[in-house]
Amino acid sequence: MGYQHNRSFNKATGAGFIIAMGIVYGDIGTSPLYTMESIVQGQGGLERISETSIIGALSLIIWTLTLITTVKYVWIALKADNNHEGGVFSLFTLVRKYAKWLIIPAMIGGAALLSDGALTPAVTVTSAIEGLRSIPAFHEAFGQQQLPIVIITLAILAILFLIQRFGTSIVGKVFGPVMFIWFSFLGITGLINLFGDFSVLQAINPYWAIHLLLSPENKAGIFVLGSVFLATTGAEALYSDLGHVGRGNIHVSWPFVKVCIILSYCGQAAWLLQNRGKSLGDINPFFAVLPQSLIIFSVVLATLAAIIASQALISGSFTLVSEAIRLKLLPRLKINYPGETFGQLYIPAVNLGLWLAASFIVVYFQSSAHMEAAYGLAITVTMLMTTILLTVYLAQHQKVKKVFVVLFFGAFIFIEGLFFAASAVKFLHGGYVVVILAALILFVMAIWHKSDQLFYKYLKSSNLNDYKEQMNKLRKDESYDLYHTNVVYLTAKMDKEWIDRSILYSILDKRPKKAEVYWFVKVNVTDEPYTSEYEVDMLGTDFIVCVNLYLGFHMRQEIPRYLRTIVTNLMESGRLPQQHQPYSIIPGRKVGDFRFILLEEKLINARQMPAFERFVLQTKEQIKKITASPARWFGLHFSEVTVETVPLVLSDVRNLEIHERISKENEVENLSK
């Protein structure tokens, strides 16, 4: 992960081709499992669907994959990489300097994409397991009962989410080959069934797509687009996974994937033309086109593909949340790094949330047909938000004519707007579940972003230069015991010599902390994903060190590891005196002990604040109670840490007036004096 050079990033290799199969195309590659089924049901079933509807629906699928996936994402969006990283948050970091309001589409798009992460595993695994009904022995035993399907699906999801904590590097090695077999299977079976009726190839003509939308034979009307959109739901994931495989591998592998997917849809359409008008009950064209001898193999392969698609989405959700945390759009959560692969991470809270949400969706909706009614709504929102951000990027970063930018924005806002309108009807048929989930995530993002702004608004700063003399006297004062050799404060606000006043309150007022060196460290998250740099300002002393760490939004914020390097560099350059330790298991140790002090600002005198600001800050305090501690987030769990609570000093809060009550005896006594 993390291509370091443009040459390797744009280069395509055989290994990269196979890896892309497993990482990038899982979601879009499992769409043939349920897209045609949803379209057939929307047209009244197999016995009522018309030839125009079949050809038109196939045409809509082909051109949706072409315009949205190929043109927008593969040709255009992949060029909008942030140091080889893609996705809605990476795109946001490229354009946020141009307008503050761009945070809004970024948050909406991110929240919608995360909510979709709960629905995709549920619908893909359920669709695959429902293929068991095509096996005679299974059908004879359970018939159309949905309970066995639900139980098997829940078991697979449980195993899938439970193994996340162990890392997926070993399993990931087989993802690519399995998905290559899956796409080959789609292409071959689709081609074989295509021989049954080559007339479906006329769907390549976009006339049939437009004709269906306007045709009275289309029983679903414009809402047929809600089912058609299922064919391209994985396009956004394709962009998000850019950093995992590189642009070159996606450019080379997508034509193969697209051909195989379209052949599968063509084969299903040909079978539908041959069997339309028949009363076969609720059937899934994907499994119906296969001979009985291949059913068991296809169910197993489809289940593996569904698991891989789910795994890719789960891993993508971990990455998305970690980016949002570092961009200060979500609270800090515990992040583990279970694998040896760079960038592989595991977030227990997100994993548990996705597992519970996916399991609830399976139990609540029962069948994939009902889940499909809710599927796609969130992704249309994410795609619209990506279009807005991408338009700003094209206007500012690319040497393209303004007319192209206008055409791009107009065309895709119109196309995706139609899909959104068609999918909006899903709200009443289950889409509200995803909308509620997305709204909750967006609420937390909005609270976190706004509270961060308010924090800087109310936090007071002081100039370190005004307190250097006091700090120097304190470190030499024999009446105080040495608190620690090095005292380190992590601060969210430091501009040159100006720092958070609460830190000086902690050093000088709360309990004078005598130390040889005072460290003030601020972590600055850069727009580049893999930055690892620092700046040091010692304010003309050898006992005050102001450190600005510049870390990319993909980098771990493990302060002690970076600090060890900085201390060594400062001592080797002579800027910091060596701290010889007489007692140590390390011979000749030159670095003393460290104590990290974390300050927790608590809101005081909240009644003096505007009601909305008070609500935001108080809500943040409640959310922080269930999130990861700063000590764990900054990699301090093996260090000596002190957590102090200090008041959030508000600039507009006045002291409360109070008058002394004087008794008559005291009043007479005072008068006599």
From Swiss-Prot:
Function statement: Transport of potassium into the cell. Likely operates as a K(+):H(+) symporter.
Name used for this protein in its record: Putative potassium transport system protein Kup 1
Main location: membrane
UniProt topology in membrane: Multi-pass membrane protein
GO terms for cellular component: plasma membrane
GO terms of molecular function: potassium ion transmembrane transporter activity; symporter activity
UniProt similarity note: Belongs to the HAK/KUP transporter (TC 2.A.72) family.
Keywords: Cell membrane, Ion transport, Membrane, Potassium, Potassium transport, Symport, Transmembrane, Transmembrane helix, Transport
Catalytic activity from the UniProt record: K(+)(in) + H(+)(in) = K(+)(out) + H(+)(out)
Compartment(s) of residence: Cell membrane
InterPro entries per UniProt: K+_transporter (IPR003855), K_trans_C (IPR053952), K_trans_N (IPR053951), Kup (IPR023051)
TM annotation in the entry: 14-34, 58-78, 101-121, 147-167, 175-195, 196-216, 220-240, 252-272, 294-314, 345-365, 374-394, 403-423, 427-447
